[in-house]
A protein has these predicted regions:
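Terminal membrane-proximal soluble interaction domains of membrane-associated proteins
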Residues: 1-53
């Protein structure tokens, strides 16, 4: 999937920047601002993301 960067802490919802666009995102657990994520799915206007280790 595409990659992005967290702009608002995901706990489990927040904002990520993907290709210059802000998206509402969901994840399992918590991901901090500045962490890189990969997009696993697009659900309407939200994306499901996973932290890149």
């Amino acid at each position: 999937g595409e990659t992005g960067i967290v702009k608002e802490t995901l706990n489990p919802n927040g904002l990520v920047l993907v290709h210059g666009e802000l998206w509402e995102a969901d994840c399992e657990g918590e991901i901090a601002v500045g962490d890189h994520v990969t997009v696993e799915a697009v659900e309407g206007l939200k994306v499901k993301v996973k932290k890149i280790p």
